[in-house]
Amino acid sequence: MKKRKPFITTITIVMIGMTIGLSSLLFTSCTSYTPTEKDLPVTTLTELQTAFPKAMYVEMTETATYAVKNAKGKVIGTVLLSSPYSDDINGFNGPTPLQIALDDKGKILEVRVLSNNETPNFLKRVVDAGFLESWNGLTAKEALNKEVDAVSGATYSSKGIQLSLKARLEVLK
């Protein structure tokens, strides 16, 4: 009997911990919060503020879609993540997930490459060529119809980015 007591105590502690963790998770998913890399793959709030200077909160509204809110809680834009919609699209060295910032009228403000396995030199060529700015100012529909030439010396990387962007915009409501 004495050997079972520590086992039961351990099980009880684990169950209490799981209950607290689940409650915390449910509470967090039902409220607005300041994004962190752990909670939200949109880099950091400071970096998000390059597209949305007045951004104070981000709230998930549906799969890979986040409402960006100002201090008063007003939606000032949207952030779209290309993953999971583009997970099967490869650049030079695997998928290249994107963060796409849209203003409150649905125009693209910024396309940002998230953590990936692309060769840094190829990705640098894409960024330096201004490739990511090719869709700025366009609506999703306009961006879907725009063909952008691949960056010389980084063809696979740039095509992967373009296809990932289009895959995400195709499912935008």
Where are these regions (language model features)?
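Detector for methionine-enriched segments
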Residues: 1, 15-18, 56, 60
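Bacterial N-terminal signal peptides
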Residues: 12-26
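N-terminal secretory signal peptides that target proteins for export/translocation
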Residues: 1-8
